[in-house]
């Protein structure tokens, strides 16, 4: 795809997002504030013994999230271990214990890290009853937690922040399921396959034979993108023509990735009674996205060497049907959200180009971030920003009329610390423990030296931020990485949720402070700039040393 076509694709994505973010955001606000339950929802509530009018305190909401997720891990793990006895197993054996644990954790945490080749490892029953179900409910849990935090800002003098079961069921049945049905049909029309054909042996034009896998791909592809999940039906993910056959399906999948995350700030603004607040959050997200995408595109278009110059850019690892701009747009959207899907190989990017997806995740995936996690991550950074502004002018910080006291800033700070600790400690242990280091360097790392370090840093960054993309040169299906990355995914998902829900409970219990002439306006460009600055500075101070040892050093050496 040439440069003009790539630019037109970017413009079309932007136009569609501008058109849909308001109605979709308003729809979600009405959905989560509604007191009406459908007949199907009432039946589910009776079945599971839930009173939809009964709300939960933040500890009760948290316990429900953890219990539901634990059951999800056990179910997905069990399906994998029993695969040989399940229908539509395609003759595939049970998945090994370590890989089953890693995969179960991966899909329940919305990470979708895949240390295996899906078409050669998972039968259709595991794909549909296990992985696809988690694609829906893990996304719904993320949105529910974000809505709980929004209620914390919107409510006053109350001890409750909603009902997890109501939020979960509404998010699944009213939002994700109907949108996925529509988008799956569109993807089928675009050439994405949907069948139960299994493996087909066909004769090639050269006179040989080839085994071609089939499967119910479109139905899983829809929620994979819409729920910012990212796990592919095939090993090549969206670079595979059965998942993403054309340039327009690639653009459509980018829209799916960004639709809910960019619409949730509008939901936030509607629920707190000031849509300008949501617009400010969208402005921050959009600015960071544009800068990151532009930088990545420049690095790839200006790849050094004879081959990149002849091809008009670094085409290694990219599909000819997409080209550079469509590939960098997809890669930026995938790593600035929590999707992690790929239509090009990030490990084959230039040194500085490969650094950009890593930085996108290190920012905390807040521009716009995952379904729900992007909004609550950005609101945590907004709390940090008003605290910094309060220190500068000597006033007690407040945000949306809620006082940001010691408890609130401690919770926000703990949230910020979780993923850097997981990334840096996980990477350090991979090289500090002699037995682990020998295994990593001898078995897992394909490229030694600076890029080998980058591969390990990328893996832990992806796992801790629940992204799921990878530098594919790293062989991750080993006992160390299956366990270490599994733990990173668990802690990276649920520790932040603990702090977010605790913050929601603390804010909901407060009264609203009247606005005065000294109140910091959080809907104006000045606050947008402050929030962008805090986001970038926190990331730079935390990760610059390891980036200097990896991709920056590699880029300077190339």
UniProtKB/Swiss-Prot annotation:
It is a multi-pass membrane protein. Signal peptide: none annotated. Part of the high-affinity ATP-driven potassium transport (or Kdp) system, which catalyzes the hydrolysis of ATP coupled with the electrogenic transport of potassium into the cytoplasm. This subunit binds the extracellular potassium ions and delivers the ions to the membrane domain of KdpB through an intramembrane tunnel. It comes from the Bacteria. One of its GO terms (cellular component) is plasma membrane. Pfam families: KdpA (PF03814). The keyword Transmembrane helix applies. The system is composed of three essential subunits: KdpA, KdpB and KdpC. One of its GO terms (molecular function) is P-type potassium transmembrane transporter activity. The gene is kdpA. The chain crosses the membrane at residues 1-21, 59-79, 85-105, 130-150, 179-199, 245-265, 279-299, 374-394, 416-436, 484-504, 527-547. It comes from Clavibacter michiganensis subsp. michiganensis (strain NCPPB 382). Keywords: Cell membrane, Ion transport, Membrane, Potassium, Potassium transport, Transmembrane, Transmembrane helix, Transport. Belongs to the KdpA family. This is Potassium-transporting ATPase potassium-binding subunit. The keyword Oxidoreductase does not apply. It is found in: Cell membrane. Its main location: membrane.
């Amino acid at each position: 795809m040439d440069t003009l076509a790539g630019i037109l694709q970017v413009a079309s994505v932007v136009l569609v997002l501008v058109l849909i973010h308001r109605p979709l955001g308003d729809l979600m606000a009405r959905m989560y504030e509604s007191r009406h339950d459908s007949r199907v929802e009432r039946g589910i509530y009776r079945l599971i013994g839930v009173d939809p009018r009964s709300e939960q305190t933040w500890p009760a909401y948290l316990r429900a999230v953890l219990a539901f997720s634990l059951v999800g891990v056990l179910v997905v793990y069990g399906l994998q271990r029993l695969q040989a006895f399940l229908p539509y197993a395609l003759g595939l054996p049970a998945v090994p214990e370590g890989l089953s644990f890693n995969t179960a954790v991966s899909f329940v945490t919305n990470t979708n890290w895949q240390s295996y080749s899906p078409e050669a490892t998972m039968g259709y029953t595991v794909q549909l009853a296990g992985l696809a179900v988690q694609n829906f409910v893990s996304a719904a849990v993320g949105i529910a937690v974000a809505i709980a935090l929004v209620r914390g800002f919107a409510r006053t003098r109350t001890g409750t922040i909603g009902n997890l079961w109501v939020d979960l069921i509404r998010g699944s049945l009213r939002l994700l399921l109907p949108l996925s049905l529509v988008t799956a049909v569109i993807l089928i029309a675009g050439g994405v396959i949907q069948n139960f054909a299994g493996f087909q042996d066909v004769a090639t034009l050269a006179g040989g034979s080839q085994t071609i896998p089939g499967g119910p791909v479109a139905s899983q592809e829809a929620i994979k993108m819409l729920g910012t999940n990212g796990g592919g039906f095939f090993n090549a993910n969206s670079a595979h023509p059965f998942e993403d056959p054309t340039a327009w399906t690639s653009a459509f999948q980018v829209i799916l990735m960004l639709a809910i995350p960019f619409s949730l700030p509008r939901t936030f603004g509607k629920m707190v009674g000031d849509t300008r607040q949501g617009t400010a959050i969208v402005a921050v997200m959009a600015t960071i996205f544009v800068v990151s995408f532009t930088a990545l595109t420049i690095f790839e278009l200006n790849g050094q060497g004879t081959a990149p110059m002849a091809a008009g850019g670094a085409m290694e690892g990219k599909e000819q049907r997409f080209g550079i701009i469509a590939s960098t747009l997809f890669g930026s959207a995938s790593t600035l959200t929590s999707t992690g899907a790929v239509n090009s190989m990030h490990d084959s990017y230039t040194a500085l180009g490969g650094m950009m997806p890593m930085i996108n995740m290190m920012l905390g995936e807040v521009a716009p971030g995952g379904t729900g996690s992007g909004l609550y991550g950005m609101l945590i950074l907004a709390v940090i920003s008003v605290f910094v502004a309060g220190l500068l002018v000597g006033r007690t910080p407040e945000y949306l009329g809620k006082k940001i006291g010691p408890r609130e800033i401690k919770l926000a700070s703990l949230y910020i610390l979780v993923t850097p600790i997981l990334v840096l400690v996980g990477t350090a242990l991979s090289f500090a423990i002699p037995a682990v280091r020998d295994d990593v360097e001898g078995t897992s790392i394909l490229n030694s030296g600076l890029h080998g370090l980058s591969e390990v840093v990328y893996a832990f960054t992806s796992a801790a931020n629940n992204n799921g993309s990878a530098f594919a040169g790293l062989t991750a299906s080993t006992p160390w990485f299956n366990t270490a990355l599994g733990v990173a995914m668990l802690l990276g998902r649920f520790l932040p949720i603990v702090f977010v829900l605790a913050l929601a409970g603390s804010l909901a219990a407060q009264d609203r402070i009247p606005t005065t002439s000294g109140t910091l306006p959080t809907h104006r460009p000045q606050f947008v700039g402050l929030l962008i600055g805090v986001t970038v500075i926190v990331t730079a101070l935390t990760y610059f040393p390891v980036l200097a040892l990896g991709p920056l050093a590699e880029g300077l050496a190339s």
